C-alpha cells in the first residue's frame, strides 16, 4: 500500500478483506491498534480510576511498567480472549519490554487457570466458551448501568472523528462495570462478607460523586435509579 494512504482507507481495505475471509469486519488481535487503556486501581491508598493515553507504544509500555512496579492482580472481562492478546501482539510488534508479564512461576499472568490474571467472564463460564456472556448484559442484570455513551461498534468512527475523550470514557465505564462485578464475585466465592461488599461498593459511589465528569455523573444517576 502507498505510504501516504490515509488511515481511514487502510482500515477500510483491512475491513473488506476481513469480511471476505470471515463475514465480519472485526480485525484479528495483531491488527488492532491500542488507543487507550483504562484501569481501576484498588490499593491501601484508596480507589483510582484512570486511563493511559498517547502514542500506542508508549501506552502499552506504561501498562507493562505498571505490572513491573505494582504486580497487581489483573481483573478483566474476556481479557484472555481479546485484550491481553492484543497488547502482547502489539508489544511484540513495537519491540517493547513486558518481562514481568511473561515471568514464569506458580502464579503468573499468562496461565489461564491461575489468579494473577483473573478473566472474570472465563471463570464464571467455567472455561467453556459456549457459556460466555456479554459484560453489558451481565452488568445490567446485576443492577449496574452497563455500557453508556459510545458502543463498541462505533469506537473506530468516533476515533476518526477526533472524539478521543468519548473513546476514553467508554473504556473507563467498561472497566468500572468489570470492577463492580469483581466485587460481587469476591462475595460469591466467600472472600467478602456482605459487609465488606457493601463497604467496597459504597467506596465506589463516594469516589464517583467527587468526579466532575459527564460520564461519571450519568453512570451514578443510572446506578442510583436501577
Where are these regions (language model features)?
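Conserved RNase H-like, two-metal-ion catalytic cores of nucleic-acid enzymes
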Residues: 1-66
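Acidic, Ser/Thr-rich low-complexity intrinsically disordered segments
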Residues: 206-226
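Metal-dependent phosphoesterase core characteristic of DEDDh/y 3'-5' exonuclease domains
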Residues: 32-53, 67-169, 173-196, 202, ...
Amino acid at each position: 500500500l502507498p505510504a501516504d494512504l490515509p488511515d481511514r482507507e487502510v482500515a477500510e481495505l483491512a475491513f473488506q478483506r476481513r469480511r471476505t475471509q470471515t463475514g465480519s469486519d472485526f480485525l484479528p488481535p495483531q491488527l488492532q491498534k491500542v488507543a487507550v487503556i483504562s484501569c481501576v486501581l484498588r490499593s491501601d491508598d484508596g480507589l483510582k480510576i484512570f486511563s493511559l493515553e498517547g502514542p500506542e507504544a508508549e501506552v502499552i509500555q506504561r501498562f507493562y511498567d505498571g505490572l513491573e512496579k505494582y504486580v497487581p492482580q489483573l481483573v478483566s472481562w474476556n481479557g484472555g480472549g481479546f485484550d491481553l492478546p492484543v497488547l502482547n501482539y502489539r508489544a511484540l510488534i513495537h519491540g517493547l519490554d513486558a518481562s514481568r508479564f511473561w515471568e514464569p512461576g506458580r502464579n503468573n499472568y499468562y496461565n489461564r487457570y491461575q489468579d494473577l490474571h483473573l478473566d472474570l467472564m472465563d471463570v464464571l463460564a467455567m472455561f467453556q466458551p459456549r457459556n460466555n456472556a456479554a459484560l453489558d448484559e451481565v452488568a445490567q442484570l446485576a443492577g449496574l448501568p452497563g455500557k453508556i455513551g459510545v458502543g463498541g461498534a462505533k469506537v473506530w468512527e468516533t476515533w476518526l472523528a477526533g472524539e478521543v475523550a468519548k473513546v476514553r470514557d467508554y473504556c473507563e465505564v467498561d472497566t468500572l462495570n468489570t470492577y463492580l462485578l469483581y466485587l460481587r464475585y469476591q462475595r460469591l466465592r466467600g472472600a467478602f462478607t456482605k459487609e465488606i461488599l457493601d463497604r467496597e461498593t459504597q467506596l465506589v459511589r463516594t469516589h464517583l460523586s467527587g468526579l466532575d465528569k459527564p460520564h461519571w455523573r450519568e453512570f451514578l444517576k443510572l446506578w442510583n435509579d436501577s
